[in-house]
Amino acid sequence: MRIGDEQLKIQKIDGFSRIYQAECFPNEFLTMMGKNKGEQARYLRWLYTWLAVLDREGMRALDLSQFEYLRETDNPRLFAIRHPHSQINERYIYIYEAGESAILLTAFMEKSKRDYDFAITRAKNILKELEESDDGTSL
């Protein structure tokens, strides 16, 4: 699984039983947040709070305003975690694997519809790279 020159893998996020991330996700989060360590910590705490809900509730989390199914995506079906009252309007796109585990794919700030379109394309490219593993196996 390669994006650019790097091997792309899925990593389990410590502290959760069913939450994973594409290996590139932490860097995308940090790039989105910029260099302000205080802001990084604050938004990471917020994200982890909602990842705990996602870990516990699975698909039922979609009943909450922080979670949404991206209707324009059917194959694959993508989902997003959103921070409704955030000043930076950050979003985290993920997918369900086998209906149970969630895999975080990308993080971005939504300033316009084009930002969402770009992030969806990015998430699909990451997913494609994950599915096309070097050993011929898929997710």
Named regions from a protein language model:
Residues 1-89, 98-102, 109-139:
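Basic, Lys/Arg-enriched alpha-helical interface segments
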